[in-house]
């Protein structure tokens, strides 16, 4: 009976294990950290919710250290490299656009000259192949006789020479085949065609077509700018070389020496170093503060877990004391019930003795055999 009473627990009470409590605390901590997610294009979370930097490809221990990682030297160098590559790509695209614009003007002039020549040539072209070859020879001799110009349009006669040479080769092949079949008739036809071609050219072509002074080609607008840029670059390189050639301390005045050598003055250099030192110290302080904050957070969690363990132990002791109290109460109840039963039995026995005594006393003692 005592064992059954000790096995019973009070109704409506739930006993929490230490492992379950630890699991609940870790889950609560995970939920609190998940709410503070870093919103940054370089922040990346994996399936387990661990934070890492996508640019540096390095894991970050917690969200508290993200700002420290961003202010770090490695992350800033990666960001600077990314910005430099982006600016270089933009600069190359911007430099290629003006170059294509500058090349449009000579191409348009070339097309205009080609169209003018194409309109003039079909007007004087006869039906015979011999006349075309002679006219090509005359045009070729004229082009060779004209002096070449250094402008961009001086390339046009060379292009026309190639076309005329191809036409001349085709005409020579036709002429050779014609000479093999009809030598005499072709010779007479050639003389007649040459004379007729000269008459046609003299009648159709203008008077100043074969002038000795051809029109000057327009000057390309960007040629002078390129030369000026080259001269400016040479001057800058010479100046830089002369400044670098001077040794340190060439001038007595340190400020003049620094200005000529194109370096920072000693005072400015000291201020710059002091600013860099302060910046580095601030970064170190922020890192140390973040580390201290993380350690404090871990210590606080450890203290909370320790306090919870102590509370669990106290609850266990209270439960033990309550169980012991229940056991003692049950024992007392059993003892009291036993005593009450004993009293009842004694009372019953006393009442039986008294009844017998009364019976004896009520009988007549003088009667024979009354006490038997």
From Swiss-Prot:
GO function terms (MF aspect): nucleic acid binding; zinc ion binding
Coiled-coil ranges per UniProt: 312-349
Modified residues (N-acetylalanine): 2
Zinc finger (C2H2-type): 53-75
Keyword flag Nucleotide-binding: no
Segments of skewed composition (Low complexity): 87-99, 194-204
Modified positions (Phosphoserine) in chain numbering: 225, 351, 362
Keyword check for Metal-binding: yes
Compositional bias annotation for Basic and acidic residues: 104-115
Region (Disordered), start-end ranges: 78-126, 143-225
GO cellular component: chromosome; nuclear speck; nucleoplasm; nucleus; spliceosomal complex
Gene Ontology BP term (one): mitotic DNA replication checkpoint signaling
Keyword list, A-Z: Acetylation, Cell cycle, Cell division, Chromosome, Coiled coil, Developmental protein, Metal-binding, Mitosis, mRNA processing, mRNA splicing, Nucleus, Phosphoprotein, Spliceosome, Zinc, Zinc-finger
Annotated Acidic residues bias: 158-172
Subcellular location: Nucleus; Chromosome; Nucleus speckle
InterPro entries to which the protein is assigned, alphabetical: Matrin/U1-like-C_Znf_C2H2, ZNF830-like, Znf_C2H2_sf, Znf_C2H2_type
Post-translational modification (record): Phosphorylated in response to DNA damage by the cell cycle checkpoint kinases ATR/ATM.
Function: May play a role in pre-mRNA splicing as component of the spliceosome. Acts as an important regulator of the cell cycle that participates in the maintenance of genome integrity. During cell cycle progression in embryonic fibroblast, prevents replication fork collapse, double-strand break formation and cell cycle checkpoint activation. Controls mitotic cell cycle progression and cell survival in rapidly proliferating intestinal epithelium and embryonic stem cells. During the embryo preimplantation, controls different aspects of M phase.
Subunit structure: Component of the XAB2 complex, a multimeric protein complex composed of XAB2, PRPF19, AQR, ZNF830, ISY1, and PPIE; this complex binds preferentially to RNA. Interacts with XAB2. Identified in a pentameric intron-binding (IB) complex composed of AQR, XAB2, ISY1, ZNF830 and PPIE that is incorporated into the spliceosome as a preassembled complex. The IB complex does not contain PRPF19.
Protein name stated in the entry: Zinc finger protein 830
Species of the source: Homo sapiens (Human)
Organism phylogeny: Eukaryota, Metazoa, Chordata, Craniata, Vertebrata
Gene name, Swiss-Prot/TrEMBL: ZNF830
């Amino acid at each position: 009976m005592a064992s059954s009473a000790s096995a019973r627990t009070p109704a409506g009470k739930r006993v929490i294990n230490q492992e379950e409590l630890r699991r609940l605390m870790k889950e609560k901590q995970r939920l609190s950290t998940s709410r503070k997610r870093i919103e940054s294009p370089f922040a990346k979370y994996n399936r387990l919710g661990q934070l890492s930097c996508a640019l540096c490809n390095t894991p970050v221990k917690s969200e508290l250290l993200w700002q420290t990682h961003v202010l770090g030297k490695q992350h800033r160098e990666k960001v600077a490299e990314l910005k430099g590559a982006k600016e270089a790509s933009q600069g190359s695209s911007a430099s290629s656009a003006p170059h294509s614009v500058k090349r449009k003007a000579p191409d348009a002039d070339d097309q205009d000259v080609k169209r003018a020549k194409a309109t003039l040539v079909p007007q004087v072209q006869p039906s015979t192949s011999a006349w075309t070859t002679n006219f090509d020879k005359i045009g070729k001799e004229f082009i060779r006789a004209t002096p070449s110009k250094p402008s961009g349009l001086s390339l046009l006669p060379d292009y026309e020479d190639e076309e005329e040479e191809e036409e001349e080769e085709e005409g020579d092949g036709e002429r050779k085949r014609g000479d093999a079949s009809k030598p005499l008739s072709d010779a007479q036809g050639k003389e007649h065609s040459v004379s007729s071609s000269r008459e046609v050219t003299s009648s159709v072509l203008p008077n100043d077509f074969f002038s000795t002074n051809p029109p000057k080609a327009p000057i390309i607008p960007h040629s002078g700018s390129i030369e000026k840029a080259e001269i400016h670059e040479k001057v800058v390189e010479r100046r830089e070389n002369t400044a670098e050639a001077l040794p340190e301390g060439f001038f007595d005045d340190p400020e003049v020496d620094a200005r000529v050598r194109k370096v920072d003055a000693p005072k400015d250099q000291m201020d710059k170093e002091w600013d860099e030192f302060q910046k580095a110290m601030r970064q170190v302080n922020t890192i140390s503060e973040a580390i201290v904050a993380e350690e404090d957070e871990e210590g606080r969690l450890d203290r909370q877990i320790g306090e919870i363990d102590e509370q669990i132990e106290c609850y266990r002791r209270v439960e033990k004391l309550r169980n012991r109290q229940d056991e003692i109460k049950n024992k007392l109840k059993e003892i009291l019930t036993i005593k009450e039963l004993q009293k009842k039995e004694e009372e019953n026995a006393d009442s039986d003795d008294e009844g017998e005594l009364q019976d004896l006393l009520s009988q007549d003692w003088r009667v024979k055999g009354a006490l038997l």
